[in-house]
Design a protein with these regions (language model features):
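N-terminal periplasmic/intermembrane-space "pro-region" immediately following the signal or transit peptide
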Residues: 4-72, 86, 90, 94, ...
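Outer-membrane beta-barrel strand-turn architecture
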Residues: 46, 89-93, 151-157, 205-210, ...
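Membrane-embedded beta-strand positions of outer-membrane beta-barrel proteins
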Residues: 54, 99, 163-165, 216-218, ...
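Transmembrane beta-strands of outer-membrane beta-barrel pores
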Residues: 58-64, 93, 103-107, 167-171, ...
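Surface-exposed loop and membrane-interface regions of Gram-negative outer-membrane beta-barrel proteins
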Residues: 59-82, 88-160, 170-188, 274, ...
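Residues on the lipid-exposed face of transmembrane beta-strands in outer-membrane beta-barrel proteins
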Residues: 83-89, 144-149, 199-203, 252-256, ...
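Signature for the C-terminal beta-barrel architecture of outer-membrane proteins
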Residues: 153-162, 177, 182-355, 364, ...
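Outer-membrane beta-barrel "beta-signal"
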Residues: 409, 436-471, 489-510
């Protein structure tokens, strides 16, 4: 009897397990069918692997320019809209793609201006270094796109490293991101804040050295390419030996320490074959771009993110930065108006103070920077309507207030003021747009031109020469002085002595 009961129990268990296994097999088949269906659907929708996010900013700027001749220019209500469409895709844990499409336009149509018959989006505002930061037309452009490989065992030593190629995320870098309320991109914004194409490789040294956040990154970029357009000649895309050489840039970023609270970054670069507009100084005729030489630069930037363990100072940010540049002109040519190698420097510091826990009532920021006579960074893409404040040969200050209205919506009020001591802060690298001349000296020369009888009529130079000779100068001295005074008088109406930009924006990010 006991054997019969035991046999019955074993039979029942076997049947039950058999039934359960059958159900499991059926479920697995259903899962496999669903996987095939999902794969088919994903294939039809490009696998739906690119993740999109939106950053839409609508702003109004009140801008003003005080010209060196005493006149003013400006725009009381420059309204614009900027759209960033962000893309991200990870093929696996080591390979990442990131990109950003950009649209940046003033409200309304553009019929050209008296200074240019070309509307916005067809002149220098399409220059590759700033094309997505300038107000252009209704077109959507590519701000950055790159792939990134992330390794974790360099040389078999367990060292983290990365390598990346593409159009770089090189705008709004370290420290400049604070006023922009953005994450910092890679470059130190004190010396590099432009769009460019290139590559980078980074090694994490923290595990080797035991120093928090230590890393070393090498970067290389192409600022311009010398190649004939398609079908413009029989040799499409061949190098034009009579044109400017391609502009290139190499450098490194070394972070000696970063524990999340104390962040120190340094950078050095060299840029080669840099241009400026060649101008006939007698007639003012523009003769096209010309190569003038090379430049090098370096920066040391420090951020303290939190001064105490708790309270308002725990979320306060303080920063300071020092940067240096040095020109290397080609033989017989002048860079920044000088035929000698000239060094320039700049210092920059600021503070950001949140009000309320987690900036419940917003954050106030204040910044100040100063640049010397021959200071020359690559900061053309800095986000103001009045040019780069960090490029100033003089003084600039900024105050801003940022408030998070909702999870997705924020506002900012920002005021930037720039006072120039020298010309050429937002120019290129030669002896025309980039030339550094004391604005006070130019004003004195223009005043002397008028005092000696000079007018806008070129023929008045004879009266100026005669009056100078009557004051005791030789004819050659008088002619040379009259030429300098006449150039100063002609330049004066186009020299900005100070500028201001007040901006208010609403920004949606999700």
């Amino acid at each position: 009897m006991k054997k019969l009961v035991l046999f019955s129990i074993i039979t029942a268990i076997t049947v039950a397990f058999g039934s359960t296994q059958s159900e499991i097999d059926d479920l697995q088949k259903q899962i496999d069918r669903l996987k095939k269906k999902v794969s088919k659907n994903n294939a039809q929708s490009s696998k739906d692997n690119i993740k999109w996010s939106v950053d839409l900013r609508t702003s109004i700027d009140n801008i003003n320019y005080d010209m060196a001749n005493g006149t003013t220019k400006g725009n009381d209500s420059l309204m614009s809209m900027r759209l960033w469409l962000n893309m991200a895709y990870a093929a696996d844990s080591k390979n990442i793609f990131k990109g950003q499409l950009s649209y940046n336009k003033a409200f309304g149509a553009d019929f050209g201006t008296t200074s240019s018959i070309m509307p916005r989006g067809y002149g220098m505002d399409t220059f590759d270094w700033v094309t997505n930061e300038a107000l252009t037309d209704n077109s959507i452009g590519l701000r950055y796109a790159y792939w990134l490989y992330m390794g974790d065992d360099l040389f078999g030593k367990g060292i983290d490293w990365t390598f990346s190629v593409g159009r770089r995320p090189s705008v709004n870098g370290f420290l400049a991101n604070l006023s922009q309320d953005d994450r910092a991109s890679s470059p130190l914004a004190h010396i590099i804040n432009v769009e460019f194409d290139g590559a980078s490789a980074k090694i994490d040294l923290s595990n080797i050295t035991g120093i928090n956040g230590m890393s070393f990154k090498v970067c290389a970029g192409q600022g311009s390419t010398n190649a004939e357009p398609l079908f413009s000649t029989a040799s499409s895309y061949a190098e034009d030996t009579d044109a400017l050489d391609g502009i290139s840039l190499v450098g490194f970023i070394f972070a000696p320490y970063n524990d999340g609270q104390f962040i120190v970054e340094t950078s050095y670069f060299q840029a080669f074959s840099l241009p400026d507009m060649d101008i006939d100084m007698e007639t003012g005729e523009q003769l096209g771009f010309k190569e003038y030489g090379d430049i090098e630069g370096a920066a040391l930037s420090v951020l303290i993110d939190g001064l105490t363990e708790d309270g308002i100072l725990s979320e306060t940010k303080l920063f300071g930065s020092f940067a240096w540049s040095n020109t290397m002109p080609d033989d017989g040519l002048a860079m920044l108006g000088s035929m000698d190698a000239e060094s320039g420097s700049s210092y920059w510091f600021g503070a950001y103070v949140p009000f309320g826990e987690n900036a419940k009532y917003g954050t106030i920021g204040a910044e100040f920077n100063h640049g010397s006579e021959y200071w020359r960074p690559f900061t053309y893409a800095e986000d103001t309507m009045i040019g780069s404040k960090l490029a100033v040969r003089g003084d600039a200050f900024e105050i801003n207030y940022t408030y998070q209205l909702t999870k997705a919506l924020s506002l900012q009020a920002r005021y930037v003021s720039i006072d120039y001591d020298y010309t050429g802060s937002n120019g290129f690298f030669g002896d025309t747009s980039g030339a550094s001349m004391s604005i006070d000296d130019v004003k004195a020369g223009a005043n002397a031109w008028s005092a000696m009888g000079g007018t806008q009529d070129p023929a008045s130079v004879k009266a100026v020469v005669g009056n100078l000779m009557a004051s005791g100068m030789s004819q050659s001295q008088a002619e040379a002085s009259a030429k300098e005074m006449g150039i100063a008088s002609a330049y004066l109406p186009n020299i900005v002595e100070s500028s201001q930009d007040f901006r208010f924006y609403l920004r949606y990010r999700f």
